[in-house]
Amino acid sequence: RFIPHQGMDESLALIRKRAKKYGLETEVLSASDYSAPADIHGEAWRRVTDTISEVFPGLAYSPYVMTGATDAKNYQAICDNCIRFAPVIYGPEQMRGMHGVNENIETACLPGAVDFYKALIGNNR
């Protein structure tokens, strides 16, 4: 997984160099570069953060570099700015099971997520 400060080509070159040092061969089976970072100064970011503040008052939020493989790359051709945000407050159990066996979200988290999307859609009419 690649990130903005070190893209696919640079990362693969470093991996090949390190592998060569130890007499190892490398083969890339599949690779794609990182998806475009969200514009945290743009209108989309402001709408999402305003809605977070409205639905989850007092909740802190912050942009960060997401190294996970998200669907954002699939939307780049039709969307200039893809905000990656899940309106769910995960508990310790959900964090431990993320992408694992029996991954789940507590039903208690769902009303907040529904409220968030209702407000986001309502605020953007």
Question: What are the residue ranges of the model-derived segments?
Answer:
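Metal-dependent amide/peptide-bond hydrolase catalytic core
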Residues: 1-118, 122-125
